[in-house]
Amino acid sequence: MINTDEKYMRQAIELAKVAQSQGEIPVGAVLVCNDEVVATGWNQSIQLHDPSAHAEMIAVRAAGDQVENYRMLDCTLYVTLEPCPMCAGLLVHSRIKRLVYGAADLKTGSAGSVFNLVANEKLNHQVAITSDILGAECSTMLSAFFKHRRAEKKALKQANKKLITE
């Protein structure tokens, strides 16, 4: 039997695939309150021309509209990639109770990998953290995306060089 964290992380992975199909970094988020999905999101920064349009931001904004409150007390956010500093701040300000993420972000992770903003005792709210839920699957998806993106850029660069030399 699949556990609850894996169930919702699988939903977040499906949303990450939507992001990837739109040319976005494949990150998906599912916000659950009282065992009910309240809102979802996937990265849309490129599509919306908005650097804040991360999966977490989109899900929490949608949840605020849904529950008519900016506080997400007793809610859990499931996200395929550890939140960045901006999204970590969002989790603290929205009073999310628990964060569950898949892959660690060794460059900007703010739930323990680089910083631990969500559990910083100097802040007025701390978020409980559960990490590495389906982490290998989330990590593999992200690695494959960036590998493909680098190959595309390399091919474009080589094509441009060829045009210049002709």
Label each region the model flagged.
Residues 2-5, 9, 46-62:
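Acidic helix/loop or adjacent segment enriched in Glu/Asp that either coordinates divalent metal
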Residues 12, 16-19, 29, 39, ...:
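Small-residue (primarily alanine) positions within well-ordered alpha-helices
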Residues 27-35:
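Short beta-strand scaffold segments in enzyme catalytic cores
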Residues 1-22, 83-86, 90-166:
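Zinc-dependent deaminase
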Residues 23-27, 73:
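Short, basic and Ser/Thr-rich N-terminal targeting/leader segments
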Residues 29, 68-69, 119-121:
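Short secondary-structure boundary/capping segments
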Residues 38-45:
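Short beta->alpha transition motifs characteristic of CBS
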Residues 53, 57, 61-94, 98:
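Helix-adjacent hinge/juxtasegments
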